[in-house]
């Protein structure tokens, strides 16, 4: 058993108020923040990198927006110059020489922030973190893997302990309301091994909105595509899901007024197509005012379209489909997961009604919206024959436009993963 890791959360330190944040000492005049989305290794151990990316990282955009807010408020001192460098390792190399030069420069603090790290990226993120920490660079790591492991195993796990033992700072949970304080710890050279914010997820009202950086978007095939999370959390209880144990089951939502200026600024730099990264936009209590905002912007002469993730029952919300169409929704991603009721019951996905799937797709099609479904293979009642028949039915009976197939995976942060660990089941 790994010895327990310290849980470091001082609610006064991480309050929005600036009185708890210590400015940078006078001898520190520059802070360079490398916001890094790590890539992943393929099955043969090679690093995956593309000539152009497909979907930009919303986490990088969130942290860029939070950093811009810190800069504007000058809470770390009027003398401190803050620079932000976005690095998406899936489309570019780590700027190793520049990072080491900044880290060694007198009067400068540099920090590498491995952001939004998912489980399939964690091995690569660990290698990056250990390499730079061994060279004396300050390193922080956050995202769903470390947050999920901390949420489900608060006593500590070997992968987290390996990082903290090497001097890497682990951040579990969301950092709105805490980012300035974390950066204060960077410039004052007092980073802690672990910050656990999972118990107090921040409200999103009046928070800085994700900022799309044009220089970052140039590395993507669709350069007019941006991301925004208008809400976080999900009210359902699927056993394979990590969202509910990291972001919680209580929906936390942005308001339309918080989004307006950012959408206009993004439009002025060529961003007019969005992917709402909310796990379930339909359960955002402010969905109608947000769609009204987009309708108004379109009526003002801006042509804005978007894709969103929703649940299978979203079409039953009065006015939701019609207003989504008017606002410019081109595609919905629906968590169908299975057309076998026994599989859905086993996964705790009781909100799905297989008998209603075809009608749901028809309603969205009647509105001119394409339906892309997520489908999981490997549930207890799947067989090779049943899966083949499911694929046929998706096309012939459900008439979905597109399906993405996923192998059932016990992701850290899910109930499935915790159960398998506690039962001593083997996992790769």
Predicted regions and their residues:
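Flexible glycine/acidic-rich beta-alpha junction loops that bind and position SAM and/or redox cofactors
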Residues: 42-43, 146-153, 178-179, 236, ...
